[in-house]
Amino acid sequence: MKKSERQAVIEQLISEYPIATQEELMAKLKAEGIAATQATISRDIREMQIVKTPDEHGQTRYAIFKTTNKNEQDRLFETLHDVVTSIDRVEFMNIIHTLPSNGNLLAAIIDDLNLPEVSGTLAGHDTIFVVSPNTTVAKQLYESFASHISNED
């Protein structure tokens, strides 16, 4: 099976079922008659920009990250406001704390923008490490992000 065909099936499965793990995705693919290794699924997830996000019931599930027609920078700033609980800077890194299950989503938005201030991101459940080329650039990024974080308690 071609990669594009497999990825089309993955997209369909993720939109139809609340899949939360690679194992669940592999089981659904197998039920569709598609055999794929965990490494292949992992590559597909990365290439397709699939992220874990909470659904309407608060359960974590895979979703395909897609930008809308909205200005991507505006989407970043809105997401910073909505999901970031705090941000700290250490040398050339910014550590962003988010609401649970939002780390990967925000990191995907940051990565998708290809900002020159960002050398790379490392995301977890509710924390993102954003690496910048140097301390000065990291400070500028910190100030930009911090200005869009909600200070409501």
Curated annotation (Swiss-Prot):
Keyword Transcription regulation annotated: yes
GO biological process: arginine catabolic process to ornithine; protein complex oligomerization; regulation of arginine biosynthetic process
Cystine connections: none
Pathway entry: Amino-acid degradation; L-arginine degradation via ADI pathway
PANTHER family: ARGININE REPRESSOR (PTHR34471:SF1)
Protein family (similarity comment): Belongs to the ArgR family.
Function text: Regulates the transcription of the arc operon, involved in arginine catabolism.
Protein name: Arginine regulator
